[in-house]
Amino acid sequence: MIPVILSGGSGSRLWPLSRKQYPKQFLALTGDDTLFQQTIKRLAFDGMQAPLLVCNKEHRFIVQEQLEAQNLASQAILLEPFGRNTAPAVAIAAMKLVAEGRDELLLILPADHVIEDQRAFQQALALATNAAEKGEMVLFGIPASRPETGYGYIRASADAQLPEGVSRVQSFVEKPDEARAREFVAAGGYYWNSGMFLFRASRYLEELKKHDADIYDTCLLALERSQHDGDLVNIDAATFECCPDNSIDYAVMEKTSRACVVPLSAGWNDVGSWSSIWDVHAKDANGNVTKGDVLVHDSHNCLVHGNGKLVSVIGLEDIVVVETKDAMMIAHKDRVQDVKHVVKDLDAQGRSETQNHCEVYRPWGSYDSVDMGGRFQVKHITVKPGARLSLQMHHHRAEHWIVVSGTAQVTCDDKTFLLTENQSTYIPIASVHRLANPGKIPLEIIEVQSGSYLGEDDIERLEDVYGRTAEPALQVVAGSR
């Protein structure tokens, strides 16, 4: 059995903590490990092979770093140039394996779900395996225990032809209003759609070709034209752009006669909203969940997430407060699904707060935007031991570098030299330059940019060990380097 872990979402409903360039699956929202790391660790038992990962190309360095940090293995990482939903993502994964002569059972898992009961998860997986081995396409259904309007529902019924504990899917139901959701719970036999599946690779491709040939044909061509770099598979962008955007549910599961459901009662949560974050955390005597430097007085059933500043909440009930360095979100717990509308409005205004945090992670380290004005920007840059930035130049800005700690190797035009703590240098406009850390401890510098234009699209990469010379820089204030 091979897990296929889908890591391509943007997590906009958990803004402002989740950003497009660092979405929720890569955040530690429910413990010390990120949701992505938890998902992989959950699969460490007999019979489970290393996972096949699917993620956005922009997130490849985050994925590799989080794997390395926990010494986690993967057999390949499929890099999507842009999202086309789950049906194409799984199609390319299945096609890759079948082409290699590995027609295995595929366990399809989103990278951002929480499952608290590992034993119950494995028991449900054993039931699903019995059905999938017989050619069925299994969906893991969460027994509908309350009238939830944020999930799609599955109606199931008994089928004597299926193994014990497995039911036939009768119909899929879109996210209902509360009245209809109450009817489903009262009637029984309804499940929330978890978005987790188990089926054989060839079975999925057979059903996909039958029910959505456009996705099948486009994905096959995109894979054939893909570029391989070690365990990275760069899916061909020009071909993939033509692929229809569709989910596994719409493309296959709602149309096939082989869809069945296995109940999963394992403390599942898709962590899809701030109210879900409140659900999965331990609460104080007044039902409050707090994180960070937070003071709560005479408040009940609130979620308060601080990220640096002191946050004080007084006399509130059922309120969510999330503070980050550059944004704050306050909402009633019943309205947190509407965060997506705020994100849409910010995107329409071209605001950078939906793209990056002030602290931006890169394959070489990170930088934090400390201050910014009309003709200047100040950054705190950290470079990992042995790492180096791209060889680059800027046409409209100069830079001043001051070493705070560690040793910097600086290239500026035809000169290469070392700087140590409290030393500084000046990089003129249009100079070809590079910053590297030759030492064994992190390098920290303060960078002061000045010039007529400070946009991060003013970067020309001439050489890059991370293969980014052909990629356009992000045209947002918090830039790319």
Curated annotation (Swiss-Prot):
Pathway: Nucleotide-sugar biosynthesis; GDP-alpha-D-mannose biosynthesis; GDP-alpha-D-mannose from alpha-D-mannose 1-phosphate (GTP route): step 1/1; Nucleotide-sugar biosynthesis; GDP-alpha-D-mannose biosynthesis; alpha-D-mannose 1-phosphate from D-fructose 6-phosphate: step 1/2. It holds the Pfam family ManC_GMP_beta-helix. Keywords: Alginate biosynthesis, Cobalt, GTP-binding, Isomerase, Multifunctional enzyme, Nucleotide-binding, Nucleotidyltransferase, Transferase. Optimum pH is 7.0 for PMI activity, and 7.6 for GMP activity. Its EC number is 5.3.1.8, 2.7.7.13. GO terms for molecular function: GTP binding; mannose-1-phosphate guanylyltransferase (GTP) activity; mannose-6-phosphate isomerase activity. Co(2+) (for PMI). InterPro entries: GMPP_N, Man1P_GuaTrfase/Man6P_Isoase, Man6P_isomerase-2_C, ManC/GMP-like_b-helix, Mannose-6P_isomerase_type2, NTP_transferase_dom, Nucleotide-diphossugar_trans, RmlC-like_jellyroll. It comes from the Bacteria. One of its GO terms (biological process) is alginic acid biosynthetic process. Gene3D superfamilies: Jelly Rolls, Spore Coat Polysaccharide Biosynthesis Protein SpsA, Chain A. Its cofactor is Co(2+). It catalyses: D-mannose 6-phosphate = D-fructose 6-phosphate; alpha-D-mannose 1-phosphate + GTP + H(+) = GDP-alpha-D-mannose + diphosphate. Produces a precursor for alginate polymerization. The alginate layer provides a protective barrier against host immune defenses and antibiotics. Monomer. Belongs to the mannose-6-phosphate isomerase type 2 family. This is Alginate biosynthesis protein AlgA. It comes from Pseudomonas aeruginosa (strain ATCC 15692 / DSM 22644 / CIP 104116 / JCM 14847 / LMG 12228 / 1C / PRS 101 / PAO1). The lineage of its organism: Bacteria, Pseudomonadati, Pseudomonadota, Gammaproteobacteria, Pseudomonadales. The gene is algA.
